[in-house]
Regions:
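Residues at or immediately preceding the N-termini of alpha-helices
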Residues: 68, 105, 215, 258-261
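ABC transporter nucleotide-binding domains
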Residues: 2-4, 11-205, 211
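Short, charged/small-residue-rich alpha-helical element at the C-terminal edge
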Residues: 224-298
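Hydrophobic aliphatic residues
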Residues: 13, 174, 222, 292-293
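Residues that scaffold the ATP/ADP-binding catalytic core of kinase and kinase-like folds
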Residues: 70, 218, 288, 292
Length: 298
């Protein structure tokens, strides 16, 4: 059964469209990356899924049915704006929020201690939230999100404030949840995290769906737009090259829509350049994001 099925969502504010005909689904055991520029309509889409607000038209089904009180307890939501009680010790905050998801105290306490230990936070469980670093608070928020073993996770910038060690720890835990069959929506501006974690991607720009599908297939579609070259010496201007990006492997050349890799190779040869490597590359999701956010939706 599909965990989330969104059909033809529309939402406007004061006559200005924020979400325009967005359709997608998320199944068990997969992570969908929800990406787009600021103000693209991602937050509105998430709020509609969570029933925080109603769409002007369109439908959302969770586990094959409309949102209900029973369905809400199958969802774990990690918002970008944190909702922890700052004057409470971490463990008290976790247990209180777990109770709102229907967990009894004994079960919640056992589960909380397990998660605190997994995240390296067990020794800090009696520390008040207000005395914790941003990264520690983020880990507590993550624990609150998953403590009731939800079937659907919706996470907005989950890695914000985390150091590299805790980022890797959380990524591993999220990957394990996916392997356990959880459906996960990951909304973030960190394209490298999307590439590492997500199976599929939905990009919204100006309220519209501009990219949707398997991440590998999406990257393959953009393969012709970039080549990686390594040469001896320096080369001059190349017609049809819109950007040069120096990296540890040489130079990545971003090509205009109507420019073929062969024409660039011919130009380099015409300049008498010794070419050690010329490879049609699959551009990073970051590059694709910039390309699509710039208004080209082909």
């Amino acid at each position: 059964m599909t965990a989330v099925a969104v059909q033809h969502l529309y939402k406007s504010y004061n006559g200005e469209p924020a979400v325009k005909d967005v359709t997608f689904s998320v199944g068990p055991g997969e992570i969908l990356g929800l990406i787009g520029p600021n103000g693209a309509g991602k937050s509105s889409t998430v709020k509609i899924i969570l029933d925080f607000m109603k769409p002007d038209s369109g439908e959302v089904e969770l586990f094959g049915q409309p949102m209900s009180e029973a369905t809400k307890n199958q969802i774990g939501y990690l918002p970008e704006a944190k909702g922890l009680y700052k004057d409470l010790p971490a463990i008290d905050c976790i247990l209180y929020l777990a109770s709102l998801k229907g967990m009894d105290k004994a079960t919640a306490k056992k589960r909380a201690d397990e998660l605190l230990e997994q995240t390296g936070m067990l020794d800090s469980k009696k520390k008040k939230i207000k005395h914790m670093s941003k990264g520690m608070g983020q880990m507590i928020q993550f624990i609150v999100t998953i403590i009731h073993d939800p079937e659907l996770l919706i996470m907005d910038e989950p890695f914000a404030g985390l150091d590299p060690v805790n980022t890797e720890l959380m990524k591993n835990m999220v990957g394990k949840l996916r392997d356990e069959g959880k459906a996960i929506i990951l909304s973030t501006h960190q394209m490298n995290q999307v590439e590492e974690l997500c199976d599929r991607v939905l990009m919204i720009n100006k309220g519209e769906e501009v990219l949707y599908g398997d991440l590998k297939q999406i990257k393959s579609r953009f393969k012709k737009h970039s080549v990686q070259v390594s040469v001896d010496g320096e080369f001059g201007d190349l017609t049809g090259v819109t950007e040069k990006r120096v990296n540890k492997e040489g130079v990545e050349l971003v090509l205009a829509e109507d420019t073929s890799p062969q024409s660039v190779l011919d130009q380099l040869r015409d300049q008498g350049i010794i070419i050690n490597r010329f490879e049609i590359t699959t551009p990073s999701l970051h590059t694709i994001f910039l390309h699509m956010a710039g208004g080209n939706h082909e």
